[in-house]
Amino acid sequence: QAEDGIRDSVASRGLGDVYKRQALIDFIEFKSTYLLKIAGISFSVCIPVWYLCRKATSFSNKDVFLVIVLSWVVASIFGSIPFYYSGLFTSYTNALFEAVSGVTTTGATILSDVESFPKSILFWRAFLQWIGGLGIVVFTIALLPLLGVSGEKLFNVEYPGPSSEKITPRIKDTARLLLSFYVGFTFLEFTLLSYSMPFFDAICHALTTMPTGGFSTFNDSINSQGMYVKSIILLFMIIGGTNFALHFRVLKAGPRGYLRDREFLYYIGLIALASMAILFTSNWYEEGSNTLDTTFQVVAILTSTGYTATDYSAWQPFIKQFLLFGLMFVGAMGGSTSGGIKLIRIVAIVKYARAELKRSLHSKAIIPIRIGQKIIPDEVIRKTIAFFLFYVSFFFIASFFFVMLGDDLQSALGAAASGMGNIGPSWGSYGAMDNYISCLLYTSDAADEGLGVDLGGRRI
């Protein structure tokens, strides 16, 4: 009984505290108590589940995957309740879409006039992304000692890949340290943004930048903001796309630690090359052709943040849009809050392909796969290739479903790549200055015709 109950406990623990904070904001603005009631319901559910599973001490492999899935499902359902009961969303489907987009930090929205919504709803959107950014699973790992449960398997599943590592001997201490960095960077960004933005806008953008989420309190995202705000957000998007374990090593060894990390050099190099390639093909009179806006948009796509500093879907020639489309698949560093395949996996696959080419010429050669000074085990390479194949396969499947729902090919490919990579804005019907309400209308029509489609995702 305890082992069965632990899945629900880990998925729901802490949600009551989240609702309590949101209820205060909502009460101040609306003089309403509906979120206080929701917080009470959350506590009434969490406490009995915790009591039933308090003696469980470990996870089986099956439990690990169930907890991962339940964490996102439960968080999305709970996250949609304030949206729905606010009366500002026309249907529960719209509320659930916005909540899933927030928790998974995808940043896709069905709202066409964000600025008309009350601050409590805008804060809740931002806070959902902040909670989802480093992973609800990591948040629960930090709380697992209260349950007496080991969280190592959860941590390894939530942050897989060649670059995953424990930065402290005990996994719960690692999770807590990651959270401290996460909170610290969020507060630092808020402080810097508050010099040029209103208090509320500064805190919301700080909450959505560090998780590389992209929800904004402005209708045009970051497009109308000044150079200072764009520069600060650009810096923290790069920080959010960096391996958090690397931040810890730099704290101990100094700034040169960044330069010693091979993946970080690839990361910065890719940003520079992509930005220069786009600038080289741009016309000086074209909107968004300046260095800051171009670099901002490259980083926003690569890190899956999804902010828009310009309408990149109107860029010409088309090769510039195609380059951004490719960056949607790559993603930033492993161990970061970004989406996509992750740069470290791409590097590992390229090195493996090169090694296999050499082996075809020298059949007896022993060629280890190295990234920096580290040799990547064959088992990790196999898992990396398997992940890559699954990712690409699901991209084509998702594209097919979007086409079946009535989208043109450009919109379908863009929406699938954006959804898989947790980016948000895309191309075509879901362009940089558009929203996803048409996607819900297509899905609703398909449901009426008996076609059930479940589209969702979480950064990996």
Residue ranges, per PLM feature:
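Right-handed beta-helix
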Residues: Q1-A2
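Membrane-proximal intracellular helices of multi-pass ion channels
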Residues: R7-S444, R458
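Short "domain-exit" segments at the C-terminal end of structured domains
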Residues: D445-I460
